[in-house]
């Protein structure tokens, strides 16, 4: 009997010039022998927002429930979504010191997307020898460069 749920491997990355500053995000999605590359940008953002956005946008591409392995070089993203988020939800999106969670809007949207899939989060060393991470980094840099070019045109 064939398994109904597809397996997808996703590599994500974010890039930012300045923090905050122009930024980009990128993701490589792999399903069977097919690779899909996506990227985007924001004119004023942070590296952490771009890391979360990369994972969020990659998951939004999926049309049906999947078994997903997400590879990220961001400890912030990996720890945030696997460890910290449970307390944030319990504390109404506040940290233990009662300060609001940064990027709560993105965390909430990402958490909602997670409920549609079975997900394993894996951390990889950035700028190393992992070809998927290298591809995601190039896409994020491409997104960041787009933001920089737009800002140059605006003067």
UniProtKB/Swiss-Prot annotation:
Binds 1 Mg(2+) ion per subunit. May bind a second metal ion at a regulatory site, or after substrate binding. Monomer. Disulfide bonds: none annotated. GO terms for biological process: DNA replication, removal of RNA primer. Keywords: Cytoplasm, Endonuclease, Hydrolase, Magnesium, Metal-binding, Nuclease. GO terms for cellular component: cytoplasm. InterPro entries: RNase_H, RNaseH-like_sf, RNaseH_domain, RNaseH_sf, RNaseHI. It is an enzyme of class 3 (hydrolase). Its EC number is 3.1.26.4. Its main location: cytoplasm. Residues 4-145 form the RNase H type-1 domain. It is found in: Cytoplasm. Pfam families: RNase_H. It catalyses: Endonucleolytic cleavage to 5'-phosphomonoester. Its cofactor is Mg(2+). The keyword Nuclease applies. Mg(2+) 1 binds at residues 13, 51, 73. This is Ribonuclease H.
């Amino acid at each position: 009997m064939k398994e109904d749920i597809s397996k997808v491997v996703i590599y994500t990355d974010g890039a930012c010039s300045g923090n905050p500053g122009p930024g980009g995000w990128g993701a490589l999605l792999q399903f069977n022998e097919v690779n899909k590359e996506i990227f985007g940008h924001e004119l004023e953002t942070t590296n952490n927002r771009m890391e979360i956005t990369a994972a969020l946008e990659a998951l939004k591409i999926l049309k049906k429930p999947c078994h997903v392995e997400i590879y990220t070089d961001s400890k912030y993203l990996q720890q945030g979504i696997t460890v910290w988020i449970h307390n944030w939800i319990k504390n109404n999106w506040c940290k233990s010191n009662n300060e609001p969670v940064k990027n709560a809007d993105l965390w909430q949207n990402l958490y909602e997307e997670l409920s549609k899939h079975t997900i394993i989060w894996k951390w990889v060393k950035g700028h190393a020898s992992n070809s998927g991470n290298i591809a995601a980094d190039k896409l994020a840099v491409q997104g960041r460069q787009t933001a920089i070019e737009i800002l140059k045109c605006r003067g």
